Every structure is written in structure tokens, then in C-alpha cells.
Curated annotation (Swiss-Prot):
PROSITE patterns documented for this protein: RRNA_A_DIMETH (PS01131), SAM_RNA_A_N6_MT (PS51689)
PANTHER family, alphabetized: DIMETHYLADENOSINE TRANSFERASE, DIMETHYLADENOSINE TRANSFERASE-RELATED
EC number annotated for this UniProt entry: 2.1.1.182
Keyword Transferase included in the entry's annotation: yes
Protein name: Ribosomal RNA small subunit methyltransferase A
Cell compartments where the protein resides: Cytoplasm
InterPro entries the record matches: KsgA/Erm, rRNA_Ade_diMease-like_C, rRNA_Ade_Mease_Trfase_CS, rRNA_Ade_methylase_Trfase_N, rRNA_adenine_dimethylase, SAM-dependent_MTases_sf
Gene3D superfamilies: Ribosomal RNA adenine dimethylase-like, domain 2, Vaccinia Virus protein VP39
Length: 259
């Protein structure tokens, strides 16, 4: 059955066998692992994973691909969850979950935020993403790539770029390079669960106007005196602050607000 990649689903199918081998090697799957693949496409990664795993879950939104997968693989070995990964409850698959996928570039950032909600259920995640997105994920403070995505993910995950994948490894070839990233949940997230919403608001406000200084972007949260107490220069920009400093701001503001 031929399948034409659909632009609305951001489909760029992995077709390079060496890249598949490299991803499987990075995963080092064990037979008993609980693993879910997001966007399996034509099964380039699905097939070799099943050679190592007793069972695999996949989440796929394209009904033609769902039909293809159900015809090609035994339901005893492969469970196909038809639907949008952005709405999927990954906690329903159990604990110590391993997640892998060649993520559609058009939903990669919201999907990463969605998956961040399930850190208590995750063992690790390995994703193929646009190289520029991976650069932002792993970026350090005071660099051009460091931003909201860096802070929001690094407060929950230890992340590492593993290798680059060129466009010719896909069909159709994307216009950008890709990279594979490994994400391992921190044993203890840097921000308390009760503070996550406030933390996200503060980080978003700080990076809303990158060229403006903190005194302007965080004026709804901090006064000049607050900066002195925190030991933070209010003339810095959002990209100059470390994640621990954003955590400190959040905890401080919450204490002041609570009286």
C-alpha cells in the first residue's frame, strides 16, 4: 500500500537504515521495556524495535497509516492508539515509560510541553526533531538559543543532543537538518508542582520581549527592592538568568504574594 506524505500532519518519513540503527542503538531497548512510539509513519523504526521488545505501543493520527500498521503487525505485539498525541494520556500506559518518535516539526514544541506533564511516568524519551529546536532545548544561559523552551524543559529534564540527521534521510526531504535528542526526567524537578503555573507565567513574561530588561518585562512581579533581596541585576535580559534564578524568583514572589 503506497502512502503519500501529508503536509497537514507534518509527515517526513525516515527512510535511512543507518539512522534507524543509530536510534535503536541509542535506545538500547530491552524485551520487557514499556515503550511508545509517537508517529510511527511507515514503520521504519517500529519493525526494528519489535525485534527487541516483547510489545510496543504506537500513537498515530493518520487513519490510513493506522490501517496499514494493524494489517502489518500482530495486535499481540503492537497496540495502535489512533488519535492525536497532543491529547493522548501517556500515564495510561503505566510507569517507567520510554517514549520515542520522529516528531512532526509543526507540533514538536506543544507536544514536548504536553509530555512534560507526565514526568512521573517517564523513564526517558528519544526524539528526532528539527536541529534548531534541539539547540534551543539544550541551550545554556547567555546564548542566542536560550529561551522559554530551554528553561521550561531543563527544569524537568536532563537533555543531550546525540547526533545530526541530514535531510536526505527522509521522504520527502525537509528543508532543515534534524537532530536526535535524549531526555531523562530529573529525579527531583527544580520547581515544585504547586508552583509550576506561576513559574511558567514568569518565564513567559520574561521572554515575551527578549530585548527588554527584566525591570520592564517582570514589572508585574518584582520591584527594585525585590531584585536587591534576590541578588539579581534588574538590568539583565531574560536570556542572562539561570534556571535556578527563575526558580528563586518564582518562590520569592509566591512567598510575598502569600503574605
Amino acid at each position: 500500500m503506497q502512502h503519500t506524505p501529508r503536509r497537514r500532519f507534518g509527515q517526513n518519513f525516515l527512510v535511512d537504515s543507518q539512522t534507524v540503527t543509530d536510534i535503536v542503538h541509542a535506545l538500547h531497548p530491552r524485551r520487557e521495556d514499556v515503550m511508545v512510539e509517537i508517529g510511527p509513519g511507515l514503520g521504519a523504526l517500529t519493525q526494528p524495535l519489535l525485534q527487541s521488545l516483547e510489545h510496543l505501543h504506537v500513537v498515530e493520527i493518520d487513519r490510513d497509516i493506522v490501517k496499514r500498521l494493524r494489517n502489518e503487525f500482530s495486535a499481540k505485539r503492537l497496540t495502535v492508539h489512533e488519535g492525536d498525541a497532543l491529547e493522548f494520556d501517556f500515564s495510561s500506559l503505566g510507569e517507567s515509560l520510554r517514549v520515542v518518535g520522529n516528531l512532526p516539526y509543526n507540533i514538536s514544541t506543544p507536544l514536548l510541553f504536553h509530555l512534560s506533564r507526565f514526568t512521573d511516568h517517564l523513564r526517558d524519551m528519544h526524539f528526532m526533531l528539527q536541529k534548531e529546536v534541539v539547540a534551543r532545548m539544550v541551550a545554556k544561559p547567555s546564548t542566542s538559543d536560550y529561551g522559554r523552551l530551554s528553561v521550561m524543559l531543563q527544569c524537568r529534564f536532563e537533555m543531550e543532543q546525540l547526533f545530526i540527521v541530514p535531510p536526505e534521510c527522509f521522504h520527502p526531504p525537509p528543508k532543515v537538518q534534524s537532530a536526535v535528542v535524549r531526555m531523562i526526567p530529573l529525579k527531583k524537578p527544580l520547581i515544585e508542582a504547586s508552583q509550576e503555573k506561576l513559574f511558567a507565567e514568569i518565564v513567559s513574561a520574561a521572554f515575551s520581549q527578549r530585548r527588554k530588561i527584566l525591570r520592564n518585562t517582570l514589572r508585574d512581579y518584582l520591584t527594585g527592592e525585590d531584585y536587591l533581596k534576590l541578588g539579581i541585576d534588574s538590568n539583565l535580559r531574560a536570556e542572562n538568568l539561570s534556571i535556578t534564578q527563575y526558580v528563586a524568583i518564582t518562590n520569592y514572589f509566591n512567598r510575598v504574594r502569600s503574605g
